[in-house]
Design a protein with these regions (language model features):
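Glycine-rich phosphate-binding active-site loops on the catalytic face of alpha/beta enzymes
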Residues: 112-115, 163-173, 230-246
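Structured C-terminal cap/extension of enzyme domains
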Residues: 6, 10, 31, 43-49, ...
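Active-site mouth loops of central-metabolism enzymes
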Residues: 25-42, 83-93, 118-121, 213-219
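Histidine/lysine/aspartate-rich catalytic loop segments that bind and position anionic ligands
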Residues: 155-187, 198
Length: 267
């Protein structure tokens, strides 16, 4: 496993995502429910342990009660994965989410991508600098996520953060509400992927690439080969896995990423 530095923190280049753990399939309400039924607390902890065994040291997950309780149990049982906390608009405001991240031992905290998209549309991005300052005051790395490239164009001019989380797909309208709603209309366009990855090349902060699989729609070999061509040396990729039908998905995804990166390095 390769590692990068984000601020003072060493981060595995493959980061474990948690949308499947929380039942966010971005496919349909039926698949959301299947994920929730499959991913019991015990099963989630099993997957995180497996990730740690192969060198993954970072989990991106929400500041909701389900995740926080699970991480508390996981650590009490000896787990050591570091938590990059994502704010959670449907269960609390910015300040509440930052305090939860602090209380439950997050290493970093970033603003939810849907929130950033929404605030951009509502012309309210001036709310964000004080939140970043609060995150830093609590001793965590600070970041933002987003699906709309314009979020990062704004951030480059107006925000001092430690990292960005850039979605390859601007897959839904967040103009009227920030949170994801199960069953909402979503789209995954190749053109959006290219626009975001072109933008990433000029960004001044480390980037965690996410939604690289288009929520399971992309062929894994193509997806990770593409990721390898656009990841910079200080970037990482965040991938959620749903292993019900493919128990070896974690190892497969890591292998595909490492093979792609090796090819890009001329190995």
């Amino acid at each position: 496993m390769d590692y990068i530095q984000i601020g003072r923190v060493t981060v595995s280049r493959f980061i474990l995502g948690s949308n499947p753990f929380s039942g966010f399939s971005h496919q349909s309400p039926d698949v959301d429910l299947l994920m929730r039924r499959y991913y019991t607390a015990a099963k989630i902890k099993e997957v995180i342990r497996a990730a740690e065994r192969v060198g993954v040291n970072t989990l991106v997950a929400r500041t909701d009660f389900h995740i926080m309780r699970l991480l508390l149990e996981y650590r009490d049982e000896g787990g050591g994965i570091q938590w990059f906390a994502q704010t959670c608009p449907e269960v609390g405001d910015h300040e509440t989410c930052v305090e939860r991240a602090t209380m439950y031992g997050a290493t970093a905290c970033h603003i939810h991508g849907g929130v950033m998209d929404h605030l951009l549309a509502q012309r309210r991005l001036d709310e964000i600098p004080p939140v970043v300052e609060r995150i830093r005051e609590r001793g965590m790395l600070a970041g933002i996520a987003g699906h709309n490239p314009k979020v990062f164009e704004w951030a480059e001019q107006n925000l001092d953060v430690d990292y960005y989380m850039c979605s390859y797909y601007n897959s839904a309208s967040r103009d009227e509400r920030a949170e994801h709603v199960s069953g909402m209309e979503e789209w995954f366009r190749d053109g959006d992927r290219r626009i975001m990855t072109d933008l990433i090349q000029g960004l001044s902060r480390p980037v965690i690439h996410y939604k690289v699989m288009a929520a399971g729609r992309n062929n894994p070999e193509e997806a990770f080969a593409y990721v390898a061509t656009v990841m910079r040396s200080g970037d990482a990729v965040c991938v959620g896995i749903y292993i019900k039908e493919n128990p070896g998905m974690l190892e497969q995804d890591i292998r595909l990423l490492e093979r792609g990166l090796l090819g890009c390095d001329g190995g």
